[in-house]
Amino acid sequence: MEQSFPLAQSLAAMAAISMLPVIAVIATSFTKISVVLLIVRNAIGIQQTPPNLLVFAIAIVLSAFVMNPVLQNSWQLLLAHSGDFGTVSGMADGMIKVAAPLKDFMLKFSDAEVRDFFVQASQKIWANAPATPIASDNITVLTPSFLVSELTRAFEIGFLIYLPFLMIDFAVSAILVALGMQMMSPTVVSTPLKLLLFVSIDGWRRLLEGLVLSYAQ
């Protein structure tokens, strides 16, 4: 008969808790949101405003909002299968069941082409491994696929956001050269104009709404 392992349960719980920050970064919307916010800050030209702490705090709050359905589903599954965590094998099965909503989330927002690449790469890199071939919905494929897909989308959004601010920089530089004011830094003039543009179009609300609603597919 399989015995209970309270020590193993404690160690597994500690390991799971220690992995939460990593999971929050690589398996949630945090990556895309934080990268887009940092790109916007650089595009405007205010390198330290808002500070990194505030940028990441905004990303955490928005990620918690986006991931709320996933967290609720995982919590309900944890309560429903709490009795399975009495043994080591039951604990492993229970963790797989609890992680199912997060796995579905990553599957939904990862590109099929990227998943296929990692499946093919695993067949080449792990050719001599004793493990059986993995599918495209395996967690070892989903995690890097989701991360790469999120980074790709973040840079696509950042490129589109960067363009109007870049045009302001070009226009200001051309005007200063035409006026013979080459000694004046274009940043001194362009930064207030970019801030004015961002505020006039209600940039923060539109940006954050767009980031949140991008997960409403």
Language-model-derived ranges and their functions:
Residues M1-Q217:
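Hydrophobic alpha-helical segments and their helix-loop boundaries in membrane
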